[in-house]
A protein has these predicted regions:
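Internal alpha-helical scaffold of NAD(P)-dependent oxidoreductase catalytic cores
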Residues: 1-78, 133
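NAD(P)-dependent Rossmann-like dehydrogenase/reductase catalytic/cofactor-binding core
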Residues: 62-144
Length: 144
């Protein structure tokens, strides 16, 4: 108990939010952190690599993406994920999704796979009608 109290005090002092978890929940908790930290950076780097291959310098690519990243996170903080969600799937523009997928064929296969996986996750967790959105999305993605 003293150790837990000390840990909570340290977490608060560092600006964190103390959370008590069952040991069995810790791997999923850490997976959530990996999604929003390490994997977020992987997505940003993927965007930078695409832009550099299109002729941007790394610095210019980073500077081009940073305002979008900052605005997205700011909007998420203010309005939540669903209200912040933008892009072709959010507006039902599956022709653009198809064009994106075709364009990604020139990059490592993982880029295309990540785009498809994240598109499906977005539809599942952000769409107002997830089942219908996933059905339409899967029709487009299955053509690849």
């Amino acid at each position: 108990r003293r150790a837990q109290a000390a840990a909570r005090k340290i977490a608060r002092a560092l600006g964190g939010v103390p959370i008590a978890l069952r040991p069995s929940a810790k791997p999923a908790y850490h997976a959530a952190g990996a999604f929003v930290s390490g994997y977020l950076l992987a997505l940003v780097e993927t965007g930078i690599q695409i832009l550099t291959r299109l002729g941007f310098s790394r610095r210019r690519a980073r500077m081009a993406l940073l305002p979008l990243i900052h605005q997205t996170l700011s909007n998420f903080e203010r309005f939540g994920a669903r209200a912040t969600w933008t892009g072709p799937i959010s507006r039902g523009d599956y022709a653009t999704v198809s064009r994106h997928m075709r364009s990604l064929a020139a990059w490592p296969r993982e880029f295309e796979q990540a785009y498809a996986a994240l598109a499906r996750i977005s539809a599942r967790v952000l769409a107002v009608r997830p089942k219908q959105t996933l059905q339409q999305l899967n029709r487009v993605l299955s053509k690849r």
